[in-house]
Amino acid sequence: RHIERCALLLILVDMAGTDARDPRDDYKHLLAELELYDKTLLKKPRIVAANKMDRPEAKAELAKFKRRYRTVDVLEISCLTGDGIERLKKELLKRVTALRGREKVSRRADQ
C-alpha cells in the first residue's frame, strides 16, 4: 500500500542483462505487475535508474532500452562504483518536491 502514496516511482533496472535477462523485458514485466496491482500506478510519474552502467555490455543494452521506451526518463547509475547516485538523489528530490507542491495547491483548490 505504500506505493499508492508515492508521488514518484523509481524503477531500478539491471542494464547489464545479468543472467541473460533483457532489461527491456524486465521493465515491461515490472509495469505489468504494477498494472495488476493497481492500474492507476501506471499514471504516476516515474524514473528508471539504469543500474550496472559500470559493466561494458550495459551501454548497448541502454541504447536498445531507450529506443524502445523513448518517453521514459532514464538516469544512469552504478551501485557498485557509486557513479550517478548523487545525480539520481538530486533529481528525485527535485521532482518529489515539485510534485508534492502541486498536490498541496490542488488540495487547497478542492477545499
Where are these regions (language model features)?
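An anion/phosphate-binding loop that grips the pyrophosphate of nucleotide cofactors and donors
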Residues: 6
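C-terminal-of-GTPase-core extension/linker across diverse P-loop GTPases
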Residues: 18-111
